[in-house]
Amino acid sequence: MERISLRGMGVALATPFNDDFSVDYEALKGLVEYQVSNGADYLVVLATTSEAVTLSCSERDEVARFVAETVAGRIPLILGMSDNCTHRLMSHLKETDFTGYSAILSVVPYYNKPSQEGIYRHFKAVAEASPLPVVL
């Protein structure tokens, strides 16, 4: 797997919502364009800042696709891929289209408080399943 260099200013994007709680794609496009045009060196999509856990699987996939298409290769993208269930995360890693992304970002399962060995096993499984470099 090729290493990537993450230098400079990375911005974790928020996910804007409409009044009906659907994703506001017009506002999301504005956020992306603002960050790219103002010098962000890379963007982090669907991390904890973006409220990714409140989105359905199809919404997460659509946001990831939309941002990748909007950025169109102008700067690197990192896709947030986290879950409290390692097994479910493995399935999501297999099903996700990573087109346009340079790496994934994964956080420690936060609800069930795994042991140090559990954290190690979780991230070992993530690293083995991910087709991209993993940022912890």
Regions found by a protein language model. Name each.
Residues 2-136:
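Active-site beta->alpha loop and helix N-cap motifs at the rims of alpha/beta catalytic domains
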